[in-house]
Design a protein with these regions (language model features):
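Compositionally biased low-complexity segments enriched in histidine and/or tyrosine
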Residues: 4-13
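Bacterial N-terminal signal peptides that target proteins for export
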Residues: 25-49
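Bacterial N-terminal signal peptides
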Residues: 46-59
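Flexible, processing/modification-adjacent segments and terminal tails
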Residues: 67-76, 80-86, 101, 130, ...
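A short, Trp-centered hydrophobic/proline-enriched beta-strand micro-motif
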Residues: 83-96, 120
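Gly/Pro-enriched, hydrophobic low-complexity segments
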Residues: 125, 145, 157, 166, ...
Length: 304
């Protein structure tokens, strides 16, 4: 497509030059024709310029069209929401089997956006006191790294990418699901608006590329039109095409920021679901970098 566009560009340019040369050689124009020369030449230039703009759009389409204002609004709001995070939270993470059996874990988490990006630190404690701690860091450009202290381990280590999609404490949430990196991917598309339940929603499709460290090929988010907060998210895994659904309940505004009190995760083809319930915390925790020492966090067992 690029080579074809360049060929057309060259063809249009040469055609334009031929028009100018032919007109300049016609010395036997009458006064009437001479008086029309300016208009004719100007019209030729206009047509050629218009054609060149069209052809350049084939080579650089993103320069030919203004940015979608709704897309810009949705992306800006989503990124700013994440860039303003500064919270502590406590609650429980529950796996509900297809037969109704429940297994609950204590959940403690905190997050803060710093000058170098977002840090999320959380700990999940099971019924037998086994603990999983993880520290997720996302840079300002969206690059993600994960450290973890898994059950039976005494020290934190970098979690290999191959394990990012592992179930977190046996639930439908994965390690990667603890962060919303999709809003920082380069490939973003705003689909036709839809209703989700009673809510009018923007529908944003975020697609990953080879530079994005993620197990997801795409993430589609339904964001409430009025508050620009996700109410439904559908993640599609690379390779398999398997989908994971996230539903947000109990939306509330605390200190000017919107959040959900519950998030339910359902994996396609797997009975049951998992529910993260936030029971307490602070939306303006004034956290510092020292609050994200995963070794100290695991040793404390509670958040200060």
């Amino acid at each position: 497509m690029v080579l074809y566009g360049l060929w057309l560009y060259k063809y249009a340019y040469m055609t334009f030059l031929r028009h100018v040369v032919m007109l300049s050689r016609r010395r036997n124009f009458g006064r009437y024709l001479e008086s029309r020369w300016g208009n004719c030449a100007f019209g030729t230039i206009q047509a050629s310029v218009a054609l060149l703009v069209l052809l350049l759009s084939l080579v650089h389409p993103w320069r030919a069209f203004a940015a979608n204002p709704d897309l810009e609004t949705v992306l800006t709001a989503s990124r700013q929401r994440i860039e303003k995070l500064d919270y502590r939270s406590t609650g429980r993470l529950t796996r509900v089997e297809g037969n109704g059996k429940r297994t609950s874990y204590k959940f403690v988490g905190k997050a803060r956006w710093f000058s170098d990006g977002l840090r999320v630190l959380c700990e999940i404690t099971g019924p037998g006191s086994e603990k999983t701690s993880l520290l997720v860091h996302m840079s300002v450009s969206g690059h993600v790294t994960i450290e973890a202290v898994l059950p039976g381990e005494k020290a934190a280590s970098v979690l290999p990418f191959e394990r990012w999609n592992d179930p977190l404490a046996g639930t439908d949430f994965s390690f990667e699901d603890m962060i919303e990196s999709q809003f920082f991917w380069k490939n973003q598309e705003l689909l036709a608006p839809e209703k989700y339940g009673t809510r009018d929603c923007f529908v944003l499709k975020s697609k990953s590329d080879s530079q994005d460290r993620t197990y997801y090929d795409s993430v589609t988010s339904w964001l409430d039109h009025g508050i620009l907060f996700p109410v439904h998210v559908l993640k599609t895994l690379r390779g398999t095409g398997q989908q994971k659904e996230f539903i947000y309940y109990g939306l509330r505004q605390v200190g000017g920021a919107w959040s959900a009190t519950q998030v339910e995760a359902k994996l396609q083809g797997k009975p049951g679901s998992s529910i993260l319930v936030i029971e307490g915390g602070s939306g303006n925790a004034n956290l510092g970098s020292k609050d994200f020492d995963i070794s100290q966090f695991g040793a404390q067992g509670e958040m200060k």
